[in-house]
């Protein structure tokens, strides 16, 4: 479960390393989970990256440490909370996605992110 003020790892090569959730605009609830789009601000970034510290982006959550129940009854959880930064058109900011991502991201319509990921779980 991701809420406001939660720190997330960034799972792409956009240059950002850590981001903080500042809003959950598209979810009519307090918490965000896998495949939700959230508003984030960059807290740690590489100096030569595209994403700069202090900038505000939208991001999709691709991994959560809290387990999520799937319709078939199985559960999925990861070791960390991670997201992929998006540009204003909903496309990934980076050109690579690092680590596995959840199948729910592809089912939501983010097929570009799923094709860049090394593994879809």
From Swiss-Prot:
Q: State the GO CC annotations.
A: cytosolic large ribosomal subunit
What keywords are annotated for this sequence in UniProt?
A: Ribonucleoprotein, Ribosomal protein, RNA-binding, rRNA-binding
**Do you know which Pfam families this protein is assigned to?**
Ribosomal_L14 (PF00238)
This entry's Gene Ontology molecular function terms read: large ribosomal subunit rRNA binding; structural constituent of ribosome
Question: InterPro entries recorded for this chain?
Answer: Ribosomal_uL14, Ribosomal_uL14_bac-type, Ribosomal_uL14_CS, Ribosomal_uL14_sf
CDD domains reported for this sequence: Ribosomal_uL14
Can you list the disulfide-bonded cysteine pairs?
A: none
| GO terms under biological process | translation
Family membership noted in the UniProt record: Belongs to the universal ribosomal protein uL14 family.
Quaternary structure note: Part of the 50S ribosomal subunit. Forms a cluster with proteins L3 and L19. In the 70S ribosome, L14 and L19 interact and together make contacts with the 16S rRNA in bridges B5 and B8.
Q: What does this protein do?
A: Binds to 23S rRNA. Forms part of two intersubunit bridges in the 70S ribosome.
UniProt cross-references to NCBIfam families, sorted A to Z: rplN_bact
Read off the PANTHER family from this record. Answer: 50S/60S RIBOSOMAL PROTEIN L14/L23, LARGE RIBOSOMAL SUBUNIT PROTEIN UL14M
Q: What protein is this chain from?
A: Large ribosomal subunit protein uL14
